[in-house]
Structure formats: C-alpha cells, structure tokens
Amino acid sequence: MKLCHAIFSTFVVFFVASGAGEKQGESQLQQIYDELSILSRVTNAIALQAAALSKTVKIREVITELLKVDNGNFSNLLSLDPAHLVKNLDELHKKSLQAVSGSNEQLQQDLKEMIAMNGLLAAVESENYTEKATVNSLIVLKKVDEKMEICDESLITIMFNISQAMSGVPFAESDEMKIFSSMKTMKKAFYKCISKFPAFMQKLYEYNYPLSGFLELNDTMNTIKALNELDIANKIPNMLQKFKTPFLNILAVGDHRNKGNTGKLLQSAITLFKKTVYSNSSTRLFLTAGFPESGDMKRVAKDLTSDWFKKKVSRGKSTAELETALKPFNQFAESMAHVFKSWNNFRDDFQTDSALLATIPDLLSQIDDYDRNVDKKKFLENFEATFRTCFKNYKNALDQGEETKFLKNFSAVYLLVRSVQAVEQWASEISTMFDEKAMDVYFEELEKLTPSNIKEQVEKITNFDDFLKIINKFTMLKSLQTQYESAYKTSNSSELSLSKIITDAGLVDTSKCLEKDKLDSSKLLKMLQFMQHMMQLDIDYSTLKANLDNFFELKKKMLETEKLVKGFTSRSARAASNSGSPVLKIKDSQKHADHLGNGLLAIKKMIISLKEKATILKSTMFNAKANQEIREKNPIDYIKEFWTNPGPSIEKLVSDLEKLEQSSKSYRKADLLTIRKVFEDGSKIVGIPEVFSYIDSQFEKKGSQYSNERKITQALSTLDLNFASHKGALSAASLSVDNLKLYFDDLFGLTPKVSVQSESTSPIVVVLICVAIVLVLVILAIVGYGFTSNGRNQYINLYLYYFGKTSDYEKRWRYSLFMDRVDGKNVLIDSVREINATNLLKAVKRGAYINVCNKYGNTALHVATRRGYQNLVEILIKHGADRSFLNPQNKTAEQMIPVNYQETHKEKIERFKSIESIYNKYRKKKFKLCVPEKFPVSSFHIYIEDRTDDNVTNEFTTKFQSITSDEAMITTTHVVVKTTEDGILETDDLNLLIWIFHGSIIVRDTWMVDCLRDEKLIEKDCDYLVEKVKYKGIIYDTVTQWSNAMAKATTPFLYGVHVALCMKNCPYLASLTAIIQGQGGTMLDKFPDKDAFNKGSHPYLHKNLGPIFLLHDGTGDLDLYRSDPDKMFTLFTEQQFMDLLFKREINKDTNPKIIPVLVDEED
C-alpha cells in the first residue's frame, strides 16, 4: 500500500512539474510576449530612472504618454487655475439656494407656462390684424392661371420615353428605334422651351409671393386657438398676483450681484476639459513603450524577482543592487497609480456629464448679463395693469364652425401653394443644370447617330450622363403640371379668410392697445428666463462641482508626482555619482526600451490577429456580388487591385502567423538570444494592406445588403494586418535584445574574462597594414558618404550634370516656383534688380531656373543687359542663360543694348562696350545649366480641398502634420483635390480653380490613400498629378501645362491684356482679379478710355484678340464694343474667359516691331 502511494505521489509531482511552466489556454506566442514584457518593463524602468539621474527626464511628456493624452492640451489644462471661478460659482449658488428655497415644482411649471403665454403676447403685439382681416384667397386666385404650361407635351413625351429606355424598361425593337431617333429632332422644341424660362420664372415669383401669404394665415389661426386654449386673458393677471413675491425674491439675487464673466470663464475651462479628454495622443509610444497598460509600472518590482527574470536574465545572480537602484522608480509608479485613478475619474465623469456641462456656461452668461437697473416691482405692476386694460375688449370664444371652415379651405389652398413651390424649385434646378455650350455639343452628337445600334451610340456620347440627368428632370414636369391643375380646381372654389374670426375675437382693438401702451413682453421674457436659470443652476450645480473637484484632485496628484520626480534628480544624482548606479551603465537605455517595447506591441498585434484567423479566412469566402462590389465600386484604387485576388495573400498571412506560433514553442525553452528570434521571424511576415476598415465603410452605406459580409469586415476593421509596416520595429527589437543581454551579463557578472597574449609584429607589416587601412578608410569614406543624404544628393547631381537628360531637369524645375523664391520674390530677378552678383552666383550655381521672366516678360539676362550690368550678364551667360529668348517686344537679350547708347547713355558707354564684348566672346560657346537642387519633402506645404474623404484627410494630416495645413496660403506647394475615377478634377468653383493658375502642383486624392499605406510615396507626387479639369461640362487637359509654365515663370499669359467688368454681380471677383493679375494682366477699376490704347495693338500672346477684355454677364447692351471698327475690344462671359485660360492657346505676335498696347507705354 505504501509503495503504491509513493508511486502515485511521484507521478503527481512529475505531472505538476512538467506543466508548471505552461499557462493553460494561452498560445506559445502569447507566453513569449508575456515573458519578454518583463524584460521590456525592467528596461523602460532603467531608462526612466537613468534619465532622472542625468536630469534629462521630461516628466510631463512621460506622464501624458502613459495617460495617452495630448501633451499640449494636458499642459494647458494643468495651467488652468479656476479658483476665482469656483469662488464666484459658490457665491452664486449660495444666493440661488436662498432665493429658491421656498419654491417648488409648481412654481417651475408655472414659469414654463408663463414663458409660453408671453410668446403668444409677443405674437399679438407684432401682428397687424387689420391687414390679416382683409386677406381673401378668392381675390388672389383671380390673378393665377388655371394651367401652367412651359414645354410642348410632345417634347415631354419624348423625354419620358428616353428616360424609360435608358433605365432599362423593355421596349419592342422598332419602338426603341423610334424613341432614340426622336432625340435627333427634339433640339428646336427643347430650345423653344428653354427660351420661355425667364418669363416663366418671373410668373412663378409673382404667383408664389401672394400665395405664400396664406401660410401666414394659418400661423395667425394657431395663435388665436392658443390664446383661447391657454385662457391667457384670465391666467396671466392671476399668476402675476399669485407669484409676485417669489418672483421678486429670485430677481433680487441679480440686483445684489455685480456683473461678472463667470459664464465665459467656465466656458474656457470646459473647452480645455473637452480638448484634453477627447483628443488622443499619437498611438506610437516613445518614452513608455514598455508600459502599454496602466498597471504595468507597478509590476517592475515583482518582475525583478520573477522566476523568468532569474532564469533567463540574471541567471541566479542577486538582483538586490538593481532593485535598490530602482526604488525611486517604484515610488514614481505608486504615485502614478494615484494619477491614473484621478485621471480616470475626471475623464469618465466628464464624458458622462459633458452634454449637461456644455449648457451651464450659457446659462451663467445669461445670468451675468441680466439687467440690474430695472425696477422689477414697478414693471410687474405696470405690466399687469396694461394687460388688463388691453384685454378687456378680447373675447375668449372661437366659433367651431368658422374654425372647421377655415381649416378645410386652408388645406385646399395649401396644396396649390406647395404645387407652385414645387414647380419653382424644379425650374430653378433645371436652370442650374443647363449649359448652352454643352447642350450644343450633345445635339451635334445626336445628329450624327446612325440607325444601327443607336442605343449603344447614345451611351458612348461624351458626358451623356449629364444630358440624361436633364432629361430625367424634364420627365417630372408632366406630373407637376397635373398636380398644379388639380390643386387650382380645388382651391378656386375655396374662400380662405380670417376676417370674421378676428373681428369676433376683438383682436384688432387688443393688438392696437398693446402696441400703443408698450406692454414690452420682451423685458418680461428676460425676467422669466433669469428666474428659470437660477432655479436650473440649483439643479445642475452638484454635477458641475463634482467635475471641478475631479479636476482639482487630478491637478494635485499630477503636481505631487512631478515634484516627487524632481526630488529624485536633486537627491539621487549625488548619491548615484558616488555609488555608480547600475542604471547608468547601459548606453542608450531609452532607445532600447523604445525598440523592445514597440517590437512587442507589433507581436501583440500578431497575437490578436492569430486569435481571429478563422474570421480572417472567412473574408476569402464572400459571395460573388460582394466581391464584385469591392472590385468595382470601392473608392480606393489599391483596394480594388488587391481584391482582384485576395485569397492567396490572406491565406499566406494566416499560414505565416501559424508558423510563428509553432516556432515560438521551441524558442521559449532556449536562452534570451534564441528567444529574440521571434522578432526576426515576425519581421518576415508581410501581412496585407489596410483594406477591411475601408470595405466595412463601403458595406455600411449599403444597409443590410451585405449584412453577413459586414459582420466579418466589422470584426477585422480594428485589426492591424499590415505587418510589413512593423518590420523596422521588429528588427530594432531583435538588436536591442542583443545589447540588453550584454548589459545584464555585465551587470550580473556573467561576462567571461578574456586572457590577452602579446605577440611581436614586424614594423614593415605594421606600416603596410596602416597604409592598407588608410586606403580602405578613404574608399569607405567615399562610399559611405554616398549613403548619406547629402552624399547621395551630391553624387546624383554630378551624374545629372554630365549625363542627365532634359527630362531629368524638368522633374526638378517643376518646383522652381517654390525653390527659387525668397519672401515671395524670384531670387534671380531680385538679384539683378539689386545688382547683387554674389546672390545671383549662388542662385545659378544651385540650379535656379535661369530663363525665368518678370511680369513684363523679360528674363534676368534681358534686364541685366538693358541696365548695363556687365558682371551680371557674364554670370548669366556662363551658366546657360538662353541668349535667343524673345521678350514681348520680340527682342533677344543682346538686342536690349540701346542702338545709339554713345548718344543716349553717355554715362554707360564703357559698360555697354563691355557687354558687347562679352556677347561676342561667348557667341559660339554653349554652357551647361547647373543641376537644380532637389525640392525636399520637408518644404512641402500641402492644402487639401473640402470635398475629399474626411477620414482619409484626417489620417493624412495626422501622419504628415508638419507639411499639411487646413488653410490655403500663398506658400502652398500642393493642392490635393477630389477627382473622378479617371483622375479628372470636376468643379465650377473658381476659388478652387485659382490654384491651377497660381502654379501649385495639383494632385489626386488617391495620393493621400497610397501615402497612408506607404509613406515613402509622399515623394512620388509626380505619379498623382491631375492632368485634366472639367469646368462647366467641358474637359480641358492643360493643368500640367499651367503648372510647368508657372514653375518656369514663362512670358505671362495675359501680358498686355486690360480687363474691365461689365457685370451687376460678380461672385468670384476676388478670384478673377487674382488670376488676371497673376498672369500679367491689368484689372481696371473704371471703364477704359479707348484713346489711351494704340490702334492695331494686341496682347503679345494673343495677336487675334483686342487688348481690352470686357467680361460681361449677358445682361447689358455691348453691341457698340462688339462691333468696334478698330477691334480694340474682346468680349467674354466669365465662362468664355475661363475657356480661353483653360485652352491655353497661344497666338504669338511675331512682328519684329510690336505696337505697344498703351499710348504712353515705355519700351
């Protein structure tokens, strides 16, 4: 028996021992994560303690990172000192308690009822009942037509049939042929219909104005009913008598209190609370990566004595010295526990009470602003007396039959009013959609249709979808006309009038009396609201006070913790310098803590993903319709591409995670250097790009259509499956484990001592080795320099200078508009203007675009030659300035030397002779252009237009915060715009289009999406350029032409153009002015005098046009200028002018003797 018991005991001990190290239910990878987290926490504690000893710790940043709040907002919060605010609030609350102590729920209810009745009084005061009594629908309806026709019924029928056919309604083949053939013949009827629109719109306005007055009659009727139902004629005087004493007690609080700004102070405090609570910090941990959870810091003390740490790190050696060194950190951890608790209380209570708290500042502001100079008692007595006098003529009786008759007739007239408004809205929408030029294009295309496959031909017409929208809109007209005619017949026999009801009630005399005796219901309203606010403050104060107390407690614990850490830096530093603290022995402890902590966070994401592997695999089994929806309609290109065949990538992800789990089992049993291989294996897992959050958003918009698939995408949308983005963190973590092992081995005396033996070496060998080392070092230095950013750029520039193509230069010249400007001025033009050879030489050597033009179309070489700056001329020629470039006078730079300078410029004779010799000297020589500097990403100023996806925009601005702005600025380099799937910018907004003519680089919104996936693509803006713009239904492909022209500052497109506006209203005046002036034109502030311009002159780049541009809206008579015999005027509508700009067609005046535009223009 004893033998059996011994055998059984031995078996139990063995079983328990063999399973002691395994945590049931946890994966091997999870257990490695838990164990390495011990090392991560200890390392982070050492790093923070070392920073405290060396006085480099940024304790506020450490705490805010632990709390996961924004450091700036939190610091602003702690700087808040609301002591004065609390004092005012306590004082006000005390007075409010005294004032409302005798009040009850009935008083609060009566206050609400008084406010409602006071609103009716205000309506009676302001209403003109004499006028309302004269309104009669039969009189108005005599002026309204029985029918409302604008288009021929045959045209509406054609459009209805086209709409049905295009939407897929089946027709016989012969009928369908007739339907589409009829499109070719409807042009005349369509334009006839459209021509009637101005008169039709005017008629609608004439109908709608008097008819809408009937709606006001209903409001008047509702007021009369309310006056009767509330019985205010008797109730108001009685209530004023009954509650005068408690009212005056409450109102007295305002009289005995100085006017303050309590509401504004509280609003500022709550705004800071809200910013701090609701704005999260960056998810990337830098100082506390070892403590991802709130309780992790307190675990460090136990980590040092844990079995795993003793076995894998200290390997049985005493940890007492390290425990002693980290005692101050443990005190910090204890103090932080109180901070966490205070923060959680503050955050949770504020989130619960935020809606209520948001209403209190306004309530307090109204109390602060209350008028204390009114004699309340006298006012209430006068109010009651005036009310009784005026309402003695009022009869509180409403005839039931009259009311029923009114409501019946109102329903009939109301249908007519709504019918007219519906037609008016339809006409307004059609007018907005209609574009004459685009319609001409559609009808031209329709006339080309042939009988065979006519529907397919129609569908291929460019932008036919826009035409179809107009057709669909017209199909609504028939039903709108029918509704109108039906409503007219019903209402035409219905007399709508309030004359008898108003007369019977005596409202005319009552309202006149109220107006004459100045009842002043608005002042009573302010008093009633003040009383309401005081009573409400008594209810809300406890919530407000609790939140303020939470804040004070949080601030107290924060300051105590910061003071504790500052104490460590003063006392501990002296002790550490004498004893040699072990926490100071490791180099870059903070870096290792950062790398190891963030590497483990990446492992944690893999663990979470591994738990969801079944759900991940289900995503490969979506039905065909859902897959097609993603491939064809997801707004993000890379997701469409990925979902063409997502299965292999997703299955490989799951397979890689399972392999990592399998290898973790063997790693756990080995030493630290073997365990770290989990990071190396993890870094090889690529994963998949972020797709599920975007797909989930796509499915969410479809309602229940993809409910089964959405359960999967919802579950996966929170997972980070793009493990390739964590490769750097995992690799860094692996290297940090190596360094940490060396540190701990040295700390615990585990490093083996190496014996050193001396050997004699030949001096010749030593010399040869030294020479070889020097040569190797020189070669390595040259090669190594090439791996630095400066070296790489310099080597690339050398290559481009000797072997580069024009296209290579063009890629960099795209940024010349921004690279070559200082304080908004081009550095070349400015250097010549200032005669600054030093700055000019610096600019050309760093590759500034050398043929840039000033606003007069002259290059720097033209200006330098014209002014006789021979040293500047030589610098420009020797650095590749184009000597054949023609300015707007069709002169080369050399031709800018005055012909008779010996007579006209005697003081510059030597200068011009020197310049002539320079041109002769280098006439047959060509010079290379210097390589333009690469425009750094850090100098990007990116502005994102409002129509882009809000989620993508917010993520992008967060990720690239330093180079993005939510404000448009003169320094903006890139403008991200919403484009179609074809990459076309569609907009009629000149405030957005102005960026094209400003010279900013216009990029598609898909750039943001791809940059979020791979931030290196921020440098590849050239792959996302917008090349086409659709304005007023027409597509133009000159966007990049404008960018390049502005980058190189070519001859201004509108040089010699003088613009005058002939419009009653120009909503885009500021944008048009900026475009015109930016392109070298002149915006005139008054109508031009033709005599000030030379006959026969033209803008330099538009010899086919007159120099005076008149922009008009088509309303004025401009035939005199249109038929000008001298062809000095060119007339444009705003759209035609933009068409000129977008086409960017140039007709250069090649005449060697250009006629100046202005009579007094200088050469």
From Swiss-Prot:
ANK repeats lie at residues 856-885. InterPro entries: Ankyrin_repeat-containing, Ankyrin_rpt, Ankyrin_rpt-contain_sf, BRCT_dom, BRCT_dom_sf, WSN. Residues 929-1025 form the BRCT domain. PANTHER family: ANKYRIN REPEAT-CONTAINING PROTEIN F37A4.4-RELATED, ANKYRIN REPEAT-CONTAINING PROTEIN F37A4.4-RELATED-RELATED. Keywords: ANK repeat, Repeat. It comes from the Eukaryota. The keyword Transmembrane does not apply. This is Ankyrin repeat-containing protein F37A4.4. It comes from Caenorhabditis elegans. The keyword Repeat applies.
